[in-house]
């Protein structure tokens, strides 16, 4: 596992965006051989999306031959709802870059047959072989996507019941009322994430410090689903200073020295 210790949220977003752009450009995608990118929603990746848009407008990257799969979507929320992840992605990213509409994949939380929708999504991911890079965030309780504590580490795309803690955390997008946050969501599974060639998790804020500590220094434990990334061959944690507060000093020092050349010019 790599840990990229940075100073603040802006640096986390910039580093993550540069890494994505470098991966896409090195891959040299074509229509027949697209780059497959997994994407999250929420507050954490906002800076990364801003930098990706800026780099696209500067001519540094094209998303014309990039296929995206989002991590999750609320169940029962109309896709036109201002807080649906469909709306979030189009407002904050897709509408500002040159990605073709047919290359965008989002879960349908209003499907008549939810189980069939989850199978369809999983099968479509597999039809491309694998996701080359999955960017994600982490919840205060260590969840990735909507794989809440005690999720199976072999799980696939499915419906999940959201914990009250997650609904309270997400209530800031619903006028502060947790009762307006849907109780269920569709999410890619832990196993789906582990199948990706590379997983990059963005961790910002002191509230995520315990989750980062569990992921880096703790044991693999389904109560901290983020810890599953210890099993991944290419996992990266990109974190700001407040999120490292629960890590041992020597752990942060080790990774800071190890990644010194990779965090220049931020």
Swiss-Prot record:
The keyword Hydrolase applies. PROSITE patterns: GLC_GALNAC_ISOMERASE. Pathway: Amino-sugar metabolism; N-acetylneuraminate degradation; D-fructose 6-phosphate from N-acetylneuraminate: step 5/5. It catalyses: alpha-D-glucosamine 6-phosphate + H2O = beta-D-fructose 6-phosphate + NH4(+). GO terms for cellular component: cytoplasm. Transmembrane segments: none annotated. The active site is at 72 (proton acceptor), 141 (for ring-opening step), 143 (proton acceptor), 148 (for ring-opening step). Disulfide bonds: none annotated. SUPFAM superfamilies: NagB/RpiA/CoA transferase-like. Keywords: Allosteric enzyme, Carbohydrate metabolism, Hydrolase. Its EC number is 3.5.99.6. One of its GO terms (biological process) is N-acetylglucosamine catabolic process. Homohexamer. Belongs to the glucosamine/galactosamine-6-phosphate isomerase family. NagB subfamily. Catalyzes the reversible isomerization-deamination of glucosamine 6-phosphate (GlcN6P) to form fructose 6-phosphate (Fru6P) and ammonium ion. This is Glucosamine-6-phosphate deaminase.
């Amino acid at each position: 596992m790599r840990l990229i210790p940075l100073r603040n949220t802006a640096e986390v977003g910039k580093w993550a965006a540069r890494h994505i752009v470098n991966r896409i450009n090195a891959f040299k995608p074509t229509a027949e051989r697209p780059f497959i990118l997994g994407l999250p929603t929420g507050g954490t990746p906002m800076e990364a999306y801003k930098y990706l848009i800026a780099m696209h407008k500067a001519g540094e990257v094209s998303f014309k031959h990039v296929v995206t799969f989002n991590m999750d979507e609320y169940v029962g929320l109309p896709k036109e709802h201002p807080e649906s992840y469909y709306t979030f992605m189009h407002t904050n990213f897709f509408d500002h870059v040159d990605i073709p509409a047919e290359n965008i994949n989002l879960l349908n939380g209003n499907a008549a047959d939810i189980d069939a929708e989850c199978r369809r999504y999983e099968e479509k991911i597999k039809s491309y072989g694998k996701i080359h890079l999955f960017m994600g965030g982490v919840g205060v309780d260590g969840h990735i996507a909507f794989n809440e504590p005690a999720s199976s580490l072999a799980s696939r795309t499915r419906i999940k019941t959201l914990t009250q803690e997650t609904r309270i955390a997400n209530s800031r997008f619903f006028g502060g009322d947790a009762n307006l946050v849907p109780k269920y969501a569709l999410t890619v599974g832990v196993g789906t994430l582990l199948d990706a060639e590379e997983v990059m998790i963005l961790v910002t804020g002191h509230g995520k410090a315990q989750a980062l500590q569990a992921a880096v220094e703790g044991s693999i434990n389904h109560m901290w689903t983020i810890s599953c990334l210890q099993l991944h061959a290419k996992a990266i944690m990109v974190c700001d200073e407040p999120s490292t507060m629960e890590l041992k000093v020597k752990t942060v020092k080790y990774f800071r020295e190890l990644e010194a050349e990779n965090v220049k010019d931020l």
